[in-house]
Amino acid sequence: MARIAGINIPTHKHIVIGLQSIFGIGDTRAREICITLKLDPVTKVANITENQLELIRVEIAKYEVEGDLRRQLAMDIKRLKDLGCYRGVRHRKSLPLRGQRTKTNARTRKGPRRLIK
């Protein structure tokens, strides 16, 4: 198994799909990395040399991925909550942030119904 950015990349998948298992790397960025390094996107991860793997690691190190990205997202949400702005209040109350209706929908975000006693 190839290990990139602390994640085990599945060896039976194509390199473009395997790179997407890293948090912060989607389809566009995975294809961009393949083009930059002149790798064929449909090459299986198992067929990539150690040299190419090291080049991929160096390229991915340029981006904010995995733990750093998760931490940044958590800090952004915490900042909104601390500011007390509309989005922060909605985060605190576990309600939708972007104007969706909540009278009949948003059950996933609001959680299970609470019984009134």
From Swiss-Prot:
Biological process according to GO: translation
One Pfam family linked to the record: Ribosomal_S13
Statement: the UniProt record of this protein carries the keyword Iron: no
Region (Disordered) location: 94-117
InterPro entries attached to this UniProt entry: Rbsml_uS13_C, Ribosomal_uS13, Ribosomal_uS13-like_H2TH, Ribosomal_uS13_bac-type, Ribosomal_uS13_CS
GO cellular component, one term: cytosol
GO MF, any single term: rRNA binding
Keyword flag tRNA-binding: yes
Keyword annotations: Ribonucleoprotein, Ribosomal protein, RNA-binding, rRNA-binding, tRNA-binding
Similarity remark: Belongs to the universal ribosomal protein uS13 family.
Record's subunit section: Part of the 30S ribosomal subunit. Forms a loose heterodimer with protein S19. Forms two bridges to the 50S subunit in the 70S ribosome.
Function: Located at the top of the head of the 30S subunit, it contacts several helices of the 16S rRNA. In the 70S ribosome it contacts the 23S rRNA (bridge B1a) and protein L5 of the 50S subunit (bridge B1b), connecting the 2 subunits; these bridges are implicated in subunit movement. Contacts the tRNAs in the A and P-sites.
Name listed for the protein in its UniProt record: Small ribosomal subunit protein uS13
This protein's encoding gene: rpsM
